[in-house]
Amino acid sequence: MFRWGIIFLVIALIAAALGFGGLAGTAAGAAKIVFVVGIILFLVSLFTGRKRP
């Protein structure tokens, strides 16, 4: 998940540098969503993950 977030962030930065406003906004929004989903899944796996015997 974090990899996809970083990929979308890089796409957004490149698009912003080249002046593609709509594409940069879309990629930045997608990066934020993927990042938040990744954090939520990490926290869920942290609390429900490996149990001690």
Swiss-Prot record:
This is UPF0391 membrane protein ECA0470. Coiled coil: none annotated. NCBIfam families: PRK13682.1-4 (NF010229), PRK13682.1-5 (NF010230). GO terms for cellular component: plasma membrane. Keywords: Cell membrane, Membrane, Transmembrane, Transmembrane helix. InterPro entries: DUF1328. Belongs to the UPF0391 family. The chain crosses the membrane at residues 4-24, 30-47. It holds the Pfam family DUF1328. It is found in: Cell membrane. Its main location: membrane. It is a multi-pass membrane protein.
